[in-house]
A protein has these predicted regions:
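Iron-sulfur cluster-binding electron-transfer modules in prokaryotic oxidoreductases
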Residues: 1-146
């Protein structure tokens, strides 16, 4: 907490655990209702999207390429739930989750929902800039207007 330099209180984040963060099952956090990332986001000073029910559903993982039509409803639910909770961004630690949820939005006709790596959120709180955090590499843009 002592390293936080930027006030993120205006930023509400939907913590997206996906299906892999809790593996090995239950050893790190509660399998059905994890809170580890929620608490870390709160420690950074950002708001947490409460009752974000999609936070543990699978994004489609490696099935997104061969079975895209089956996976898109899952991404739709992940994004719609974050939008319903008034989140301005989704945060995840999984590279495949980040890519799937970020890239799949272009075909879903939904309002844009940026998907940040948790480390990018850390960087924002610690005062790193857009260039340092490679925010322009995200497919759904995220602006640092905090």
């Amino acid at each position: 907490k002592k390293h936080v330099k930027v006030d993120l209180k205006e930023l509400t984040v939907a913590p997206y655990y996906g299906c892999q963060l809790n593996r090995p099952w239950g050893d790190i956090d509660d399998l059905q209702h994890p809170v580890m990332m929620d608490r870390l986001i709160e420690t950074l000073g950002a708001g947490v999207a409460t009752n974000y029910s999609a936070k543990t559903i699978c994004c489609g993982a490696s099935h997104m390429m061969p079975y895209e039509k089956s996976c898109l409803p899952q991404v739709r639910r992940i994004v719609n739930d974050a939008l319903a909770k008034e989140a301005r961004a989704i945060s995840t630690v999984c590279p495949l989750c980040q890519f799937n949820v970020d890239a799949a939005q272009s075909g879903l006709d939904l309002p844009d929902m940026p998907v940040l790596y948790f480390t990018q959120l850390l960087g924002l709180a610690f005062g790193l800039g857009e260039k340092d955090l490679q925010l322009k590499k995200l497919l759904v843009p995220f602006k640092i207007a905090i």
